[in-house]
Amino acid sequence: YRELRRWGFSDPSAVTVFGYGGAMLPETFSENDIDDLNQLPVIRTDSKILFYAQGPISWSYNEKTKEYDHEQNTYSTAGYYFLTDSKNQSATIVEREGGQTTGLQDITSFDEHAVYEQELYSPGSTGRLFLGDDFRYTTSKSFTFELPGVDNSSPVKLRTSFGAKILGGTATLVFTRNGQTLPSSNTDNIGAGSSSSYDFVRMTSTLKEIDLDSEELAFTLLFRQNGGSLSMARLNYFRFNYKRKLQLYNGSIQFRLGQLPANSCYNLQGYSTTTHIWDISDPLNPVSVKPNVNNGNARFVPTKGNEEYIAFDEQATVASVEFIEKVPNQNLHGLTTPDMVILTPKEYISYAQSIARLHNENDGMEVAVIDHETVFNEFSSGTPDATAYRRLMKMFFDRKGGLDGEPLYLLLFGKGLYDNRKIGETGKYVKYPTLLTYQHGSGTDERQSYTTDDYFGFLDDDSGNRIASDKLRVNIGRLPIKSEQEAKDVVSKLYNYIENNDKGSWKNQVLVVADDENYAIHMEQAEEICSIMENSDCLLYTSPSPRDTERSRM
């Protein structure tokens, strides 16, 4: 409560919590999508309020590998929530009984997961892949990880993802532990493929199962180059899947089982009168479980078998949160449906408003100029997410009547980066305000990874994950400005264009520019576009630089 008072809440006991944290929004629209902010149930003690919060890493069970996979939020390094004391009635948490546990097999360990990942470098300055530790110059590195409570009756599964780029050669990953080389497999090798000229990096994912006799996992990873010219060798991540004893650690534990044994129940050790067990399978609507307790052991039956649970002691020290800013009242959901939306960083609002006036006065358009951070507040719990832009446009599109409604326009007034989080070796030095970009593909192959603003215009129900076939329902443009001077210059050019009545060649001739890669398919596509334009009889082919015979595939 002391911290809440420092943030300006005079009565911390009246504070309520809204939001859904740091997990990336689903990219496919569905009827289960969250609209606006939801209130979370909390536990109130004499000194604090407790609620379940999600961070930027999401986990899911892989039925094929029998491991838990993780996904980093490609737009944010944190999860955000909103606090208010505006007389909201507290959300109540649903309770359920722990069920009949007599005669059932006790589950005393669970499937734990963890990840070591440093996102430092984008191999192709595109996509969502960021690699970590560099092995080019120091080819052998030792690692030590503490795994408190590991159940040594089962091996630790160590999943290693690694990337390298070697011209004319291959490489091998070699793992050693206690002076002994671990058994090798084909997935330890990184080789050149048939499309290596298009590769930014070639990745491998290899699995080692390691038996432990303590809570410490130590090993050495050697990157062994087998000929060729090396330009990149980086670790992506180590991911750990292992059995862990089911008990509280420093006052809390989050647990689950990928495969639940028949006729079984959880048996949590170290339970007390101040311990709570929540089913957080639906993190927005946690369910409190009332276990059967005997001598500090809490037994309860899972309802389905694949639920996610958290147990915590309300008196224990919990993770602290960071104050970000005070948020003024807003209501994008209450806006009159516009003809055009201009999304921009707040630094360029006045220039965007000039563009809005231009379209209003000359085209009769109703234009909404919106600070893009306010979109996150209502459509992604305050957490930056490109899908929040899309959800805003989906709301307006549906209100206009969908395909039967009037046209809708979107202008992105601000430059974007492939590094949305500004975490890489280039992005972290960018100081100008940016808008988010949608990055398609992992970023390993230049033919399969690209940036497209079309994503913000895929507004049909169930659209969003089929870039090649989803239909564009919004007219979209971007003015990639990165300074106030550029914003001023762009606005001036737009006004000059609209207000200049000279219908000379500068308004009536079009130059279409296309890449000559991929066997000139893009040039053919450009010609198809030209064929539907008027006055497109002349096509000018030019190369801005000397041709590279290896990369020019005509």
Regions found by a protein language model. Give the residues of each.
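Cysteine-dependent hydrolase recognition
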Residues: 1-543, 547
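Positively charged, low-complexity/disordered segments
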Residues: 546-548, 552-554
